[in-house]
Structure formats: structure tokens, C-alpha cells
């Protein structure tokens, strides 16, 4: 049987890595030949989950067409967030929980997008629908994905379905979701050894908002000041990225996982749109965004509206 590659977005987060592994596991148990792969480096939070549940990181790839004809996308659909040669392969399936944008195919496909907080929540349903048992290690990775995307169930993206799925998966994995989850998030929030280049690319996504080209990066921390004291370095590197990619705006969202607030650092010609979107005033290119923790639900929609005005 012809091999299929399954992958999430560039600059992978925990949901992207763990959902690729989980969906490949399900597809293989259903008789397919699927391999999970990744499009970037594994972050500290994800590595914690992989190590805890004794799972290998997926293989790193830059292109797919040199290996396979068909691919499956998890945790994303927008072309600019996907593999470099996405136009040269057939997208067979998409399993996602984000907005649909900049996406079209030449062939029909299986497309499943649900308004839940995490791709792994959808996959939990799919295991059940196919009467396939979830192994302990896979359950642990799927739980990790939900905890990551929902910030331990505190994010506004978190739904009752995510909470219910996490409860089921924690039982299979044999862990206490709260205790394990906090340790995992803290592992991801240790930014002390990260370069500024790493900080702005750990979890960065590019969007087309109206006619504007925008990159939004997010980092989690237990102390915003730890990141803010590197502001001069961050601004220098971000300005370089803005010039290289011809961006209208680069927004770095520094999220305090304990206080559930974020600090925005905005660089680019359209930085004023951040003020409009959040009804804040940028001082020295930064503003506190009270209660904002979700890029998907609290940042992208309001910025999209602001860019359209």
C-alpha cells in the first residue's frame, strides 16, 4: 500500500506533533501505511510529553513530493503554514480545528473541522467511531495536546468536549491531568536557554488578514518580565524578519500561563491596528492584553476585523 505522510503546521506545537502521531497510529490500525512527520523543531513542552510517554519524535522533513503522492494535514489547513511543496502533493484529508483560509484542492477530500479547542479532541472521537482502542502512550500524547491547546482548560477555546476527552484520555494514560499538565506547561515555559530567534519562531504562524501579511508568534511563560527584559534584542530580530518576509505586522504574544494575561509586542507598518483591535495604547511597542491567552480565538479574529477597516 502506498505510504501517506501525516503532519501538522510549521513551527510545531504539542497538538501538531501529538495529533500527527495519534492519527498515524489510527490510520495504521485501520490498514493504511501512514507515517507521522514534523516540519520543524520540537519545543520543550512537546519534548516533555514525548519523554514522559516514551515516544519518539516524528522524523523531520522539508518536502513531501519526493517521498509520497498523498498527505494528510492535521491541526492546520492554510497553505503558508504547511509543507513547502504542498502544491505538488494530493491532500487526502484534513483534520483541524482552525478557521479555513487560503485552502483549495484539485480533488475531493475528507475534510473534518470542528469548533473545539484541539485536534486531539476530534481524533478521540474518530478512534471511537472506528472502534479502535487507544493505547496508553497515545492517550497520554492526546491528553498533552488538549492540555497544551487549552492552557490546562483555562483558554476560551476550551469546550466541554475537550474537557470530557481529556478526562477519558487521562484515565487511559494513568495520569492526573492537572498535576501532569502543570508540569508539562512549566517545561514549555522555561525560556531561559532560548535565543531571541528561537523565542519568536517557537510557535509562529503566518496569516493573510484582509490584504495584509501578518505573523503572530506566541510564547508561554511563568513570568512576562523574563521575556520583556530582552525587548531590545527581540525588536531587532523581529524587525529583520519583517523586512525579510515583507510583513505588514509581526505580533509577539507573551502569555503568562499562571495569570492568564498576555503582553503584546507589535512591530511593523500596521502596528496601530493592534491598538484598534484590543482597544489598548502601545507604549514602547508593547501593551498588556488582560485575559488574552488564545491566538486562535482572541487575537486572529479581532486583528482580522481591524485590518479590514
Curated annotation (Swiss-Prot):
Q: Which residues form a coiled coil?
A: none
Keyword Transmembrane assigned to the entry: answer is no
Identify one Pfam family in the record: DHHA2
Reaction it catalyzes: diphosphate + H2O = 2 phosphate + H(+)
Tell me the cofactors it needs: Mn(2+)
Enzyme class, one word?
hydrolase
Its GO CC terms are: cytoplasm
- Compartment(s) where it occurs, according to its Swiss-Prot or TrEMBL record: Cytoplasm
Q: What is its EC number?
A: 3.6.1.1
Cross-referenced HAMAP family: PPase_C (MF_00207)
Quaternary structure (record): Homodimer.
Q: What is this protein called?
A: Manganese-dependent inorganic pyrophosphatase
The source organism is Bacillus subtilis (strain 168)
Provide the gene name from the record.
ppaC
